[in-house]
Amino acid sequence: MKVLLGLLLGYSVLILAHELPDLPRTQHPPKSELSYWCTYVPQCDFCWDCQDGICKNKITESRFIDSNHSIVNCRVFRDSKTQSCLYEISSKMPNHFNMECLHPRPYTGNEIFMRTWGGGDHQQLSIKQFCLYFIIGIAYTGCFVCALCKNLRLRTTMKLFILLSILVWLAQPVLNRPLSIFYTKQILPRTYTPPMRELEYWCTYGKHCDFCWDCKNGICKNKVLDDMPLIVQNDYISKCSITRFIDRCMYFIEPKIPYIHYMNCSLPTYFS
């Protein structure tokens, strides 16, 4: 019995000590790992099979899209020492995201600033997050030094810190929006009338946009959603403009007071 326990213990140590071979940085991971990578980054080009200008997802076997439409270049590699995987979205603006290679998890949120369910995942700060937090740190340090140098009262110092904290809180929504300077081009310019082939996609999200309705004799019917009830012309219909960046889509309701909604161009889901 002791010998058996010793063998099991030794075998366990060997398993734990075994390192996964390093996967070189590549744009084409092994086929055996496609299911893993495409769970996290379904918009990467290696997740799609394109023929005659039409692409089909290799894993989900659905979501037919035009060739090179909403597909971005990604690079992946595995670090055997840290037992973590990492992928990069484009070489011009890499987005590093570490995850446990043996425990893939489904994700939520957009792909540039990915957030995963559960613990154990480490999300790297984006460039603008790092810059903002760096500026915040300098501002707090400056307030503290200023309070010491000018020998300000505690009450005045607390007011300064509260004011600065309010400004930081107001700046938080900026972190969830992409900066246009990080993108080199736009695939689809902002427009009020998307192509006919994309109506099903856009009207899944912006079902109240005016381009989603076919109006005759003052009565309108939704072009995509058959279960939507008929409405009076221009009733509950708002103007929407749409745009697509290299890796994401967004639509705006009312240009003057925009309601911005980001989405994954290659994987539309119902907007709630």
UniProtKB/Swiss-Prot annotation:
Membrane-crossing segments per the record: 1-17, 129-149, 156-176
Domain of life of the native organism: Viruses
GO CC list: host cell membrane; membrane
Disulfide bonds: none
Pfam families recorded: v110
Glycosylated residues, chain numbering: N68, N264
Membrane topology: Multi-pass membrane protein
Coiled coil: none
Predominant place of localization: host cell
Similarity remark: Belongs to the asfivirus MGF 110 family.
Keyword Transmembrane part of the UniProt annotation: yes
Localization: Host membrane
Protein name: Protein MGF 110-11L
Alphabetical UniProt keywords: Glycoprotein, Host membrane, Membrane, Transmembrane, Transmembrane helix
Record function comment: Plays a role in virus cell tropism, and may be required for efficient virus replication in macrophages.
Upper taxonomic lineage: Viruses, Varidnaviria, Bamfordvirae, Nucleocytoviricota, Pokkesviricetes
